[in-house]
Amino acid sequence: MGTLPLDILLYIIDLLAGGDDEDIESLQNLSQVCKSMVPLCRKHLFSSLLLHYSKEDSERFSNLLLMNPEIARYVRNLNYRFYPPLSDHELNILDVLKKRSSLQSIRLSSPGMIEWNYLPESVQSSLVFLIQLPTVTRLDIDDIIGFPATALSGCSNLIDLRLGELKLAPPEVNQVILRSKITTPVSLHMWRTTLGLAALLDSASLHAGGPIIDFSRLQKAKFRVESQDDIGQVNELIKVTSRLEHFHLNRE
């Protein structure tokens, strides 16, 4: 019996993986048909990784990566929701992602406000490394207190930046930031994070190397603010933009 052409197989796989009704079970079954189907299906089966309250899930995926570390290269989207205490399995997963992944989208959040410095230093350094990967184009950070603003300076190819319920830690005075390319997002979405916006806008006077983020090429901006002071900070950001096409402001 003949086999289907590769382009037809790819079409079937993309069809199963597309849309909101992703057929995981069919993809899993298809990957077991023959060896050549494994990498084609893994591309979709492992494209998104959610780390959250289920320590059992983290343990299973950590063990899977230990046996098949090449799986990490299929992960494109990381959604990490902190549920302390963090397990060693979570750290193991981050370590493998650092070595083998080409993440494109990262979301860091917490079910309630969490202090950045509460996280183990090994987790902090791994997360900063990952968000600064040159392949990352979208970053979403929510519900974190004291996230270092300078960590954003190394996100060289960031296009879409989303910050919510976030309190950034400003750079230290005269702090030197080493980078090859300044962060220049095209889209910015901030809600209840105007203190963070102030830290980013004022950063140029605090350290050598210019501002942490260059907003001059911003094309889309959306803000949710709570006070007149917040609106003032948004106005300061608008002053440095030169390509803004879409702007939305919602006051609560």
Language model features by range: what are they?
Residues 55-63, 83-243:
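Leucine-rich repeat
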Residues 47, 74-76, 186, 217, ...:
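A generic secondary-structure signal marking the coil-to-beta-strand transition
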Residues 14, 18, 39, 164-167, ...:
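Positions within ordered alpha-helical repeat solenoids
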Residues 108, 249-251:
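A generic structural motif
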Residues 11, 244-248:
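C-terminal capping region of solenoid repeat domains
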Residues 2-92, 115-118:
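Hydrophobic regular-secondary-structure patch
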